[in-house]
Amino acid sequence: MDLRLYDTLTRRKRAFTPIDPSNVRMYVCGPTVYDFAHIGNARPVIVFDVLFRLLRHLYGDDHVTYARNITDVDDKINDRAARDFPDLPLNEAIRKVTEKTAAQFQADVAALGCLPPTHQPRATEFVLPRTDGKTDMVTFIKQLIARGHAYEAGGEVLFDVRSMPDYGALSGRRLDEQKAGARVAVDAHKRNPADFVLWKLSSENEPGWDSPWGRGRPGWHIECSAMSTAYLGDVFDIHGGGLDLIFPHHENEIAQSRCAHGTHAMANYWMHNGFLQVEGEKMSKSLGNFVTINELLTTEKFGGRKWPGEVLRLNMLRTHYRQPIDWTIKALEESETILRRVCGRIKQFEYARRGMPTKERSVQLNLPPEILEALVDDLNTPLMLSRIGELSYDDAFDHALLSIGIDVLSYARWLRSQEQYASSNVDELVVARLEARMRKDFKESDRIRDELAAMGVVLKDGKDADGKPVTTWEIAR
């Protein structure tokens, strides 16, 4: 079956023809690591993980290269570091913020069932020329200047948008329609209001690198152009991200890459997922409906309970990736009901009910034609999920859900463990351990802790609002 994908640039669904079938290449914009990822950030991660899995199924695991960057240099990071660690030197504070946030991001997306990309380059590793010869940002900018597409002014290096005749093709914005101050920075040094920063100077207190234009740091857009070139080449197959990145980020990536390399394209297919709102409203901290992936997984902030990663992932995929999605408690409950029903229909669930341990599975997926037909039609996961109930043999349920990253057997085992622990004396043991700790009987406390650990119970000690010791628990996944 032929894969067809909706291409934002041509505004139509196109048959996918890779440049090199032995090395299909995809780049997706990753997180800026200044804060924990929210549920809206999870959507492109899940969507393009499904595409990564599908490409591997169609072309082979060893014939797909997927790069997703980590932006660890940004003014938001600087501000967060100064706020959270005011007593530390800024560079040290930045390192603490980015390392903690990046580690949490990796844990979150793993809990959502996402495969690690082939490459996850960090922006700070690609600012200056590298010993391995991979493309870096300073060299990229010098190339743009040499080709007449960038200029130095007011201590900055700026991209000259007039040097690219079809600038704005991705977003459909003509240069004469773009007003200064409307999503383009006002700068008296610019030749055109839409010109954007490639390099800016850093103050003594700001992070920076020595360059031909003075000590400074890269602009946002140049990072992705350099890192995608480093791992995927001048022109590659697919570039993905959220709708909010079409302008200015992806538009400017295209301009930089095409002008630096003298190519007809940066990527042959541009894919974008739709927006996410929460309970019918735009997600924002001021409305109190802002929720991170970690909060959904580990706290009772949303709906008064924790949500398994499989439920979050299924809920995301019940809506087509290009359509807007309303993230609601009701929808999550419906997704959980669907998963429970599927578990009940798989004969292997009987093994899970007997408590067999979860094992890493390497499964050669045998996808029924009707399932694959839906997936190759622009990742039509809603259609694919609607067809699961029509399948007539048990393995098909398992393989169909595995193809979109949901390990239903693992989820089934977890369900069974939850049922077992609900009827056990875990709560009593947790209370007994806490009491032993409070009376400083650490030998007894450690004994109970080890007993619970052997049962797969993970303990978390803390304090309540009044400062009193409390212990919560959960089942290890």
Swiss-Prot record:
Which EC numbers does the record give?
Answer: 6.1.1.16
The Gene Ontology biological process annotation of the record reads: cysteinyl-tRNA aminoacylation
Note the SUPFAM superfamilies from the entry: Anticodon-binding domain of a subclass of class I aminoacyl-tRNA synthetases (SSF47323), Nucleotidylyl transferase (SSF52374)
According to the UniProt entry, where does the motif 'KMSKS' region sit in this chain?
282-286
Location in the cell = Cytoplasm
Q: Which Pfam families match?
A: CysS_C, tRNA-synt_1e
The main location class comes to: cytoplasm
Q: Where is this motif: 'HIGH' region?
A: 31-41
Name the enzyme's class. Answer: ligase
The protein's UniProt keywords, in alphabetical order, are: Aminoacyl-tRNA synthetase, ATP-binding, Cytoplasm, Ligase, Metal-binding, Nucleotide-binding, Protein biosynthesis, Zinc
What cofactors does the UniProt entry give for this protein? Answer: Zn(2+)
Q: Where does ATP bind?
A: 285
Per the annotation, how and in what number is the cofactor bound?
Binds 1 zinc ion per subunit.
MF terms (GO), sorted A to Z: ATP binding; cysteine-tRNA ligase activity; zinc ion binding
* GO terms for cellular component: cytosol
Residues noted as binding Zn(2+) in the record, renumbered to the chain: 29, 224, 249, 253
Catalyzed reactions: tRNA(Cys) + L-cysteine + ATP = L-cysteinyl-tRNA(Cys) + AMP + diphosphate
Q: Does the keyword Nucleotide-binding apply?
A: yes
Family per similarity comment: Belongs to the class-I aminoacyl-tRNA synthetase family.
Summary of subunit composition and partner proteins: Monomer.
Provide the protein name. Cysteine--tRNA ligase
Q: Which gene encodes it?
A: cysS
